[in-house]
Amino acid sequence: MEGLSFGPLSILPSLAEELNPHRVAFLTNTTVERLWLEKAAEGIEEPIRIVIPDGEKYKSLETAVAIWKRLQEEGFTRKSLLIGLGGGVVTDIAGFVASTYMRGTLLGLVPTTLLAQVDAAIGGKTGVNFNGKNMIGTFYLPNFVLIAHETLSTLPEEEIRNGLGEVAKYALLDRKVYALARNFEGISETLIRECALFKVEVVEKDLGESGLRRILNLGHTAGHAIEKLSNYRIKHGLAVSMGLMVASKVGEELYGFDSGKTEELLKKLGLPTGHPFRAEEILEEMRLDKKAWYGRITFVIPVEIGDVVVEEVDEAVLKRALEATRDDSGSGDCQKPGGSA
């Protein structure tokens, strides 16, 4: 597994130096360039700086081609280090570029959003969008991931909530994270660390997502469908939150799971507990999900806190869960994180 480090940006030069790279290049976006690039690059000799526009639409093959060209022009080699500094879009495309340029270069990731720190930057998944989200990608472990808590200080409230959707997922998967999250009063380094370490533990056992790693898709089958139906106006973490509630209702019917625990947790984190779409709309999207097998919908189902199963679910069960969690108010029953449940 990649080297996971927790600390300030000031330790980045030493992490890079350990790899003895031929050159160092930073890949970031326009927002993070303004906020953090100068500080991150301090102490690194004449780094190449590659800045892409903000936004999911720039996670594309066209962007990757432009980065490959720039690296080639700069004399970047397999012994050079590409550092992805930014949120999930940046870390995904940095990993994809590093894994494909000259069949693989050195790679470091410095995630600057909560979503990336607890999930997107960990585990070696890379990708670009191509007629769908992450349809072209690789598995490629970075040489290091630096989680610098300071970078969250400039993160807007909506991006904190976006990341909390993944925190809620880990809380249902791991009792230690659940204990921290149900007493949530604000983002702590301990909470981020426990989420990240849980994912590392799972990925180490199943890098290629052939078995155990599939539990990390909890909330994502319905979540991705909701995200897509909203034309991505509903952010990923909020869609995952809605998906967690759907999965919990499935678990309640099939295994007697207490879905009230999920609802209480989501409210504590200021996350939505309902979705705005018709059940059949979501079912249709779930049938197209890349996690479906021959159109059959595979679901991660909570049995109890810290225990899930992965199995095909009858569509009648899914439909009942989707209908039970529909919320037409537009609010999804949200409140500010840390509020009483």
Curated annotation (Swiss-Prot):
HAMAP family: DHQ_synthase
Textual note on the cofactor: Binds 1 divalent metal cation per subunit. Can use either Co(2+) or Zn(2+).
Coiled coil regions, renumbered to chain: none
Subcellular location: Cytoplasm
Official protein name in the record: 3-dehydroquinate synthase
Species the sequence originates in: Thermococcus kodakarensis (strain ATCC BAA-918 / JCM 12380 / KOD1) (Pyrococcus kodakaraensis (strain KOD1))
Its EC number(s): 4.2.3.4
Catalyses which reaction(s): 7-phospho-2-dehydro-3-deoxy-D-arabino-heptonate = 3-dehydroquinate + phosphate
